[in-house]
Amino acid sequence: MDFNLNTLQHFALVFFEITAIVITLAICLLLLAVLYMYIADVTQSRHTIRRNYPVLGRFRYLFEHLGEFFRQYLFAQDREEMPFNRAQRAWVYRAAKNIDSTVAFGSTQPINRPGDFILLNGPFPPLEEEIKPRSAITFGAGYARQPYSTNAFFNISAMSFGALSVPAIRALSRGAHQAGIWLNTGEGAVSTYHLEGGCDLVFQIGTAKYGVRDEHGALSDDKLRAVASHEQVRMFEIKLSQGAKPGKGGILPGIKVTEVIASTRGIPVGQDSLSPNRHTDISCVDDLLDMLHRVRTITGKPVGMKAVIGQAAWLDEFCRRINERGLQYAPDFFTVDSGDGGTGAAPQSLIDYMGLPIQNSLPLVVNKLQEHGLRERVRVICSGKMINPAGVAAALCMGADCVNSARGFMFALGCVQSLQCNRNTCPTGITTHDEELQQGLDPTDKAHRVANYAANLMHEVEVIAHSCGVAEPRLLSREHLLIVS
């Protein structure tokens, strides 16, 4: 018994001695590190804060980094954050999870800021038996050999494979099929992951023409036919510009160009994928009309265009030349992208200041088409920060036939607005190709959330339409909307 006690005492003494030595060494190393940082800070001249406040000044970088993650949870109010505030995101999260999205007590939304909108209710909303189902809309009727019809007015906007991860694309494809909406492929070409869900696809032709380019980078008729041979590819969209970066081509950082993405796009692995700032074969309105007509003739499917509106004088020439050359040269649809649209990577000056917001550009395009007698020929789609029912309803009031959203569906997938899209470090696995980070994104579960979000949003837009006094959303018009001035 005494032997065991002595042995335990001996081991305890040895343990404490070793612990004391380790702690002493750690303190010495820490002091040496602090001394090294102090000398380095006071002798360097690049960083003023570190020179004036050696060692302590280094905490600035730590706090800046942590602020990206904690600011939205600890300091921001419900309606403060940009580009999307907590109230906007929370509605999407609840809709995607198919849980109660009602709120209590009163609104936190200010209604007196110039540029904001107010939806105008009608005195006699339709009764339940007077409500109509969503009407269908057809693209390319009378001009495309295979026109496309849908009754969905809310769809998934362009997000390319490369900007998004494999599980994100798979979830969007499956969810779009469940909800009966389309998925725009973005400019990164169509992949097997887009096709596997069985949803309708809109193939976007970007300035680099990924997926439909020949060895010289020009548009290939044979590859167009190959893409059009997929029954799921319902329409084609020629991208002129993007809301977050008008006049700048697409940017996919080399860190996100994996082997499968490089193979899909036809580019080198690991190198930055930089698209031209415009189509090399489109330098005027007539070139654009020729391209629209060519793609429709080859594919037999509806063909439209996507553009951010800034200088608007070209729209008159665009409409005039269509009437002069014939309606077969008109786009089957015109996607108006807001100047505050989203992106995976873009210069901040373009994100912040370039291009008109949708509340200015959408009515402008609709008015121009009406003035030139083209509104019935050209369907109008819009995109840009419309992730909640009220925003979608407002766009329908302003004249849109359909509304597309990209970031709304990213929130449905689980996006937490960490602003890491361009770093390949997205914590939710949506915009990263790090397989460890992708493990948290289950395509099967997230597909249900994508479908729930689309269904719940369209249902609530129907509720708004009924409050405005019309039987279904496509009957909304400008008399149902007030812009605060």
Residue ranges and their predicted role:
Residues 203, 209-211, 254-283, 344-359, ...:
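Glycine-rich tight-turn/loop motif centered on a GG-T
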Residues 213-240, 357, 367, 378, ...:
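Phosphate/diphosphate-binding loops
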Residues 230-265, 419-436, 461:
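Mobile "lid/hinge" segments at catalytic clefts and subdomain interfaces of large enzymes
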Residues 274-438:
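Glycine-rich phosphate/ribose-binding loops and adjacent secondary-structure elements
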Residues 415-478:
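Active-site or pore-adjacent capping/gating segments
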